[in-house]
């Protein structure tokens, strides 16, 4: 990463497969050091993280912003690649602790600035229960949406179609990455969400692609063949000793939305032309022409019906997430009057002058 570069991701999200978290694999590499934040809702964790992020930017550091899928305007974490250190909100639902306290991380409890004895505990319990119910309903709609995914239509794709997609991927890999050298150490594969289904709808960070890549291969994914292509790209790049970013699909995380290879300035994205940032060189790989067109026409009515139903389920999921977020905002409002924000601000100013990440 270059100095001053800012990228954005999600480390966890609600998906059709349930709550899907990637934070443990991101926080645990032995060369990384994370300060784990603790504290309740409304205790200033996201504000603290934004101040840390801004301080890193002001110092000319590359900054990775890890957004909260429950409230995309908030942050779950900040990471400084050049310093191999960062901060992360280690509270539920993404509870985490340093693997080796003092060696791989430390704690920072912002809850110490909260007068817990003054809290309305009955109100807190009621709001938490209602919020959980809306999230459960959202999860049910997301599960239904995943089940209606047209890419999984029975009889749409045959084994020879998958093999044709893999052959195309191998050809592109040979051109972009060459062959693995003898004794080459495998590269590292980092998994991060480029997009998530949130209370504001689908949030996608195309500027992150632009920050890492000058060229993008846009892959058709109407028939689900992009996964075959991306799996080959990811494995080949890693065998060639290249570090890659593998981004799961926001609805079906067992699928892949994108594979980025920053050191080569190239990315591979399953999506539509609207997903490609302006100014990037684009090559369109038309994978949807591989399955037999007669077969596709025969299934078109079923696929269109499933797609319509899926969009309705997704809209309902977003509405449930919106209601959950409104209740979470009410929950934060219960905590705020009990917080000593003046003391927290003073502490933050002092802490930012001493933490090695900034």
What is the predicted role of each segment?
Residues 2-59, 211:
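N-terminal accessory targeting/assembly segments
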Residues 22-33, 50-54, 154-165, 182-183, ...:
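Short N-terminal helix-initiation segments at or just after the protein's N-terminus
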Residues 4, 160, 356-358:
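Extracellular domains of the immunoglobulin superfamily
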